[in-house]
Amino acid sequence: MIHSLAVDLEVFENMISFTFVDVRDYLDKFADCKGALTDTLTVEEIKSRLDSVKNWIFYVTDTDDSQMLELIDFFEKMRPITKDDGTVDRYDLFGYNNQAYDDMMTRAFLMYWNRFDTSKQLCSFLKEVNNKLISLQDDKDALWNDSLLNVIRKYRLPYVTVDLFKVYALNSAGVNVDKDTGERKKYGKSLKQVSINLKWYNLLDFKLPPIDDEEGDVYRKKDEYKGMTNEQLNHLFVADFDRYLMPKYIKPMLHYNKNDVFLVCEIARQKPDEIKLRYSLGHAFKLNLLCSARSNIADKLLNKFYSERSGLKEDAFKNLRTQRTALSFKRIIFPHIKFKTKQLQDLLEEMKKVVIYRTNKDSFVREIDFYGTTYTLATGGIHTQDKPVILKSTDKYVYVHHD
């Protein structure tokens, strides 16, 4: 049996919190809804049902570790159990970018929770890990060569991760191109942006009030902030998650966190097919595909098949490459490709004469106007230059997209 929970955690200088929601219970509570919840229910009804969904919230602060053992026990109960009939009782944790962030923070917490004398020291250490993960996220080499993070990665989590950020390829929602270097960098879609697409009833962001005297006195106890005014501290602490979370702000922060976890459940409710696909393929081919986009699923299946046919372990071949400094298109255009239209015949002959080099591969671009549509051909593929438009099917016309 698989127990499905959605999870999100938050880290501050003096606090870590975990919020869990029972995914199955969430789906049952809204089983009568199709599409966005706001298309079917009033806001009051949505909030009422959400209040009845099973959830668990834990937090540990620098002054309060009363929930520590309860939280550790909650994680320990997630460890898989193989029954006498061979079935496995396990927990699958759904999240958003949880494979890269939440899992690492959870590993750090479970590894180090009992290695410090005080919860204050633990919170400080977890904030250090948090800062490393965030500061190194755009530097993959540094991220994977950091000694502390590599130690933490070795901890085996008691649950199975389902990362919806990757399942729906939202980690590569678009590409930014550096105008000076031409370097292309993929960017992801935040959970807040996704909430708009889901037509979620509560577009919530966590924002702390300006630093007041009570919070300012906490900072001024440290030598580096001694003598600073509240105004100076407000200019210094721009990011809310870098601040000391005062007890009076814990409740609104947990409410914000819970809203994010409900959003994870809502993604699964509105778009279940991609998740079901990964469970069925994973079961059929004995692979973990629960954090894989479709393209990555193809890679994993191909590696598995090649490994089985060749007898080689995956590590022996997956990083092998054929290095080419030049590539003639004529060598990769199959001879059976022919066109009846002279315009396309001319384009085909032109393409056969093209040779690209490693240094100029991004400079190859061709445009062709064909039956009223402009097509752009580049080394990355072919794309149409379409005007933004919304097309809706009716009883008379059905719009079908082919790619």
Where are these regions (language model features)?
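Entry/capping segment at the start of metal-dependent catalytic domains
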Residues: M1-T40
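Two-metal-ion RNase H-like nuclease active-site motif
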Residues: I2-E10, D163, Y399-D403
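The start of beta-strands in P-loop NTPase/AAA+ ATPase cores
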Residues: H3-L5, Y91-D92, P158, V398
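Flexible loop/turn segments at secondary-structure boundaries
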Residues: E13-N14, D102, T384-Q385
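Residue-level signal for well-ordered alpha-helical scaffold segments within enzymatic catalytic domains
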Residues: T19, M104-F109, Q193, N197, ...
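Conserved DEDDh/DEDDy metal-dependent 3′-5′ exonuclease domain
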Residues: C33-Q193
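Conserved "right-hand" nucleotidyltransferase catalytic core of DNA-directed polymerases
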Residues: K179-K186, N197-L204, I211-H402
